[in-house]
């Protein structure tokens, strides 16, 4: 890639940032496409990748005219009607191939699962910036990816401590609204001055529902009160598992101990997160619940550009409310904290188990309250082991946990 200082962070008139978008057909991927297409002067889309949505990928390729596309379904990839000159990239390493292309400056990772770890590490190793919405990258692999990001930042700091790229977050950029908010609150601040990170949560659709959640249906759980998201993350929001995963992400992203990461229920979803400093000050980032905002910030850092999202109308909102999370009623948050403290192996077990448990709930083979029970069982069984796992060990653990679910070794 070209040096970030020559391709990014120079405001209007800079050379377009060359982007590879992995996971372009999912919820985050489609919104990323909207952001990229809205700023053709700022971005050139070099590569697109998707898992199975061939039709959507084909439409995106026609719209953005990338140099290369990849699709998990290689038969469908061969049949795609692509613009003249667009290369088809297949194989198990397709995401890695796209992530390290010489004509790529920034890689958006909107794919799910532990399979995203390899392309993230490959991209950073190639000195490409990564903007990630993939939770597994940090929850299970934070011990693998953050040292690479910190090394890149350290090299830049040695030359100029004021360089925006002297910060690991300039290399591994969070797309989550909460982590984007904390990142923005920390700009210009030193970590020794930070007392605590405050992750806000809407509380989901069952915040004030009757106490018994065992009979909750998938349709009810998918009715998020403020955000429009994919099914998996919407269910995770309802159980508060999503917030637990974000606690683990925060630990790795900001190198902050778990005792200094707090969760606050904020039903209006206006404050996306906040930072409390040692002098008693509190800095928060406010915005409408629109994922295009954190996506765009991750792409344009350290600059800001006009966005299709609107700013919050504080007078119209009127008031903001806050409360502590009820971890007895939503135990997934507690289980996630415990997994994070145990280490990467337990965190990996947590996130794989959650993926399978949510799929079972959506298929109506597991009750809503069974989700945290399965998470706790997986962490207890698979969360302890020697040393910190590498990528191969994490992928092996993924297969082992899925096999345990399939054979009934872990029940609901």
Question: Which residues does each PLM region occupy?
Answer:
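Catalytic, metal-anchored helix/loop core of enzyme active sites in primary metabolism
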Residues: 1-412
């Amino acid at each position: 890639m070209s040096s970030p200082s020559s391709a990014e962070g120079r405001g209007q008139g800079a050379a377009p940032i060359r982007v590879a978008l992995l996971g372009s057909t999912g919820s985050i991927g489609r919104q990323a496409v909207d952001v990229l297409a809205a700023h053709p002067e700022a971005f050139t889309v070099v590569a697109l990748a998707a898992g199975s949505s061939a039709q959507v990928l084909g439409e995106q390729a026609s719209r953005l005219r990338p140099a290369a596309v990849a699709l998990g379904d290689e038969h469908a990839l061969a049949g795609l009607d692509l613009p003249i000159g667009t290369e088809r990239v297949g194989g198990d390493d397709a995401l890695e191939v796209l992530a390290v292309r010489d004509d790529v400056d920034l890689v958006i990772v909107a794919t799910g699962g532990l399979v995203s770890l390899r392309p993230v590490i490959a991209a950073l190793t190639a000195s490409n910036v990564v903007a990630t919405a993939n939770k597994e990258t940090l929850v299970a692999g934070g011990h693998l990816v953050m040292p690479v990001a910190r090394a890149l930042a350290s090299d830049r700091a040695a030359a100029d401590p004021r360089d925006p790229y002297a910060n690991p977050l300039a290399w591994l950029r969070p797309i989550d609204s909460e982590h984007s908010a904390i990142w923005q609150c920390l700009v210009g601040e030193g970590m020794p001055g930070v007392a605590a990170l405050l992750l806000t949560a809407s509380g989901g659709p069952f915040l004030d529902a009757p106490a018994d959640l065992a009979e909750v249906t998938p349709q009810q759980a998918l009715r998020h009160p403020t955000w429009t998201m994919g099914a998996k993350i919407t269910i995770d929001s309802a159980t508060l598992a999503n917030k637990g995963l974000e606690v683990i992400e925060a630990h790795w992203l900001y190198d902050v101990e778990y005792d200094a990461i707090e969760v606050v229920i904020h039903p209006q979803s206006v404050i996306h997160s906040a930072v409390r400093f040692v002098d008693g000050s509190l800095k928060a980032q406010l915005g409408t619940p629109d994922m295009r905002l954190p996506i765009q910030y991750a792409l344009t850092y350290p600059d800001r550009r006009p966005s299709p999202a609107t700013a919050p109308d504080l007078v119209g909102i009127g008031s903001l409310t806050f409360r502590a999370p009820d971890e007895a009623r939503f135990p997934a948050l507690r289980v996630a904290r415990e997994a994070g403290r145990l280490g990467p192996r337990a965190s990996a077990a947590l996130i794989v188990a959650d993926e399978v448990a949510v799929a079972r709930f959506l298929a109506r083979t597991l009750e809503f309250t069974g989700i945290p029970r399965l998470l706790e069982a997986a962490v207890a069984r698979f969360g302890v082991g020697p040393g910190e796992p590498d990528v191969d060990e994490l992928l092996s653990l993924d297969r082992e946990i899925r096999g345990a679910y399939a054979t009934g070794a872990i029940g609901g």
